[in-house]
Amino acid sequence: MHEQLPLHDRALEARLIELETRLSFQEQALNELSEALADARLTGARNAELIRHLLEDLGKVRSTLFADAADEPPPPHY
């Protein structure tokens, strides 16, 4: 089939095949990046929830240790 096409048309067809191949790879890369972004967002949400719980626990511990504000040590810059 290629032998019947003029040289210009064969070059055009080769370029079209190259572009279709690149597009296919770009679509695959986009899907992989999309999945990675979704995973990163999920990890970030989990970490934010974990930090929230840890801060709550820290507040409870501080309340127990320093029930009176006078018992609390001064900030480090004093």
Swiss-Prot record:
Q: In which family does this protein belong, per the annotation?
A: Belongs to the SlyX family.
State the protein's name.
Protein SlyX homolog
Instruction: Detail the disulphide connectivity of this chain as listed in its UniProt entry.
Output: none
Q: Which residues form a coiled coil?
A: none
Recorded hits in PANTHER family, A to Z, give: PROTEIN SLYX (PTHR36508:SF1)
- Give the originating organism: Xanthomonas euvesicatoria pv. vesicatoria (strain 85-10)
